[in-house]
Amino acid sequence: MIGLIRVLTTANAEVLHEHGRLILEMYAVPVKSDCIPEQPLGIYNDETEQLANPKIVALGKHMEQDGCKVLVVSCAADPAVELLRRNVSVPVIGAGSAASYMARMIGKPVGVMGITDTVPAVMLDILGDLFIRYIRPEGVTNTTDLLTPAGREQAIAAAKTLMEQGIEVIVFACTGFSTIGLAGILRKELNIPVIDAVEAEGLIASNLYRQLRGE
Amino acid sequence: MIGLIRVLTTANAEVLHEHGRLILEMYAVPVKSDCIPEQPLGIYNDETEQLANPKIVALGKHMEQDGCKVLVVSCAADPAVELLRRNVSVPVIGAGSAASYMARMIGKPVGVMGITDTVPAVMLDILGDLFIRYIRPEGVTNTTDLLTPAGREQAIAAAKTLMEQGIEVIVFACTGFSTIGLAGILRKELNIPVIDAVEAEGLIASNLYRQLRGE
């Protein structure tokens, strides 16, 4: 199966499995999710990223030993993705790099949407000259803010602001947007490609999984 | 539907539709294929590429007017892909760039396999530091050569040569390899990811098509 790493600690099974469940529903591949220990707030600065890196590697190595054929680090910042690749022999996919390379396949100007202050470095590096602007929906600091009618309107308004500046593709820099189905809302309202980070990691991971299974 | 451009002129319906048929079978999306006029030998040098470019743009524009939601230039050299993007508003996917970005999502050293003398520039540019070596199976100058048992052995031998040099992903620089099912043979023999150019363009094109259809 696919091993999916959540980079925040949770005992809530629904939260733990939400990305894996989406990938199973979209691509009909088995996903085993697990999370790193002792970081209930996840990764939010350099210090917490340094703290998480060896835990991500340890969990990925364990998942490989457990039989996972493809690993996914399900976070738009791609934490420890390069490091994990040096420690396992199975393919390792990061949400941020998968989404950004998918945008590059389209080759049009990109607007990035997220809820943090800045775009993950890995995404800026990959998007390069296609990157136009980053935006955070007004008043939104948590994905649950987007579940209200007002939050939804703010997300659509933010996407429209990006489009006014010439972007033709939207990329999410937040895996929380996947859980609330924001991509579907924006696609319906605006009729432009929206690259959802969990959809992108799942698209490539499920393709590799099927290959390596001999399907 | 998806509009798929073949960059060689053919009156043979089987040849014309072979990439579209593969994409339909793999991803269950409708594909309309058409080819550029008056180039039965396709693109094989700078002069024939210059000759083909305006024909690709004209065909792509016609396909967009005809209702195609996504266009695919089904050639590993990505001819006229950037030019076509400036002339239509729908997404344009190139086989070479889609396959190369897909390899970058995996992030491991890449070996490229093809039947021409050199790797398309667009693929080298994208693969960058991940590119290790290009190889052409010995004695193979035409994809039909690979349909013989000897040709098949040569392709497997070429892949093994790449792996001995440390590559962990194989990317095809020839869409003819898709038609003969070479990826499946190599995956079975060698158990490493093989990025097939038609599979890669179809993976992204079908995803975008479904998005823009509101699925």
Regions found by a protein language model. Name each.
Chain A
Residues 1-51, 111-150:
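N-terminal glycine-rich anion-binding loop in soluble enzyme alpha/beta folds
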Residues 33-34, 72-73, 92-95, 171-172, ...:
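General beta-strand structural signal in soluble alpha/beta enzymes
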Residues 45-62, 149-158:
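Glycine-rich, highly charged phosphate/nucleotide-binding loops
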Residues 50-83, 87, 174-180:
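Beta-alpha junction/loop-to-helix N-cap segments that form part of ligand/metal-binding clefts
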Residues 63, 68-69, 107-108, 167, ...:
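Short, high-confidence coil segments that cap the C-terminus of an alpha-helix
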Residues 72-73, 77-80, 158, 163-189, ...:
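Hydrophobic alpha-helical
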Residues 85-106, 186-205:
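Short, acidic/small-residue loops that bind anionic groups at enzyme active sites
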Residues 98-119, 207, 215:
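A short beta-strand-loop micro-motif that forms or neighbors metal/cofactor-
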